[in-house]
Structures are given as structure tokens and as C-alpha cells.
Amino acid sequence: MPVTPVAKNGITYALFVCGRPEVKDAKFFTSNDEEFQVGVFERGAGYEVKPHQHPENRHEVIQTTEFLYFEKGSASVTVFDDDWNELHKQTVKAGDFLVFFRGGHTLTMLEATRLIEVKQGPFKGEGTTKVFRKS
């Protein structure tokens, strides 16, 4: 199961990309209308990405999207909808990446783990960026 979208009622909450999915040239795993685009490129030696810039493109960020890449270790990941109903649970390991678009999530490290997180800014300060589930 290399690519697992987690969706409910046609809305994507998360995307798990595990292992090394087969890619020819370039493959984006996100839809064009998502606020955050994630793809994998495989290019041969000598392939050149021509010098370029990305023009200013202002848009409103409705909800923060998180991208996590697991460099080492493993974790159990649970994805929730907006009402904290569990949608999906999966173990991820080194080399896997996932994207959280909306809803909630939790991670439990199963061993010493190193991961890289990427998300939109600006950072508005502690206490403003997360809503925790009430116990």
C-alpha cells in the first residue's frame, strides 16, 4: 500500500506515501486544488531544471497543512475528522512521508525517530496554531 489517501465524504484529510512508489519522470500525489502540493521526481543524470522563479501568487491559507518525512525510526499515526472520529490508523517508517490537510492527527513513536516537518507560515506563536482534543 504505497499511497493511501484518507478521505471522508469526498474530502481528503491526509495522504500516506510509504516506501518508494514507482514514478516515471514526475508524479504529484495531491490534487491541483489542494493548498499544498506534494510530488516526487525521478530524473536521469544530466537532466536540467532550467533557471526559474515562482511569481507572486497571493492566496488565503484556510488551514495549515503539515508534511512529515520520516528519516529514521517508526511511528503509529492516527487521522481524525473534524469531529475527532478516527478515520485511519497506520504505522510509518523511515523513508515514508505523509501530509495532513485537515482534521486532527496523533503520532506515537514506536522507536527513536527523526522526522522533518514542513508547513505554511507565518508562525503566529504558541497557543495559536493547534487545537487539542478534549479528553
PLM regions with names:
Residues 44, 70, 93, 100-101, ...:
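A short, compositionally biased micro-patch
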Residues 40-42, 51, 67, 89, ...:
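Conserved hydrophobic/aromatic beta-strand scaffold that supports enzyme active sites
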Residues 55-58:
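Compact, glycine-rich, soluble single-domain proteins
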Residues 51, 77-78, 98-100, 104-110, ...:
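Short beta-strand His + acidic residue motifs that chelate non-heme Fe in jelly-roll/DSBH
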Residues 40-44, 60-77:
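Short, conserved beta-strand element in jelly-roll/cupin
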Residues 6, 106-135:
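Double-stranded beta-helix
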Residues 81-102:
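Short acidic-glycine-tyrosine-enriched beta hairpin
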Residues 1-42, 135:
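A short, N-terminal "cap"/entry segment at the start of jelly-roll beta-barrel domains
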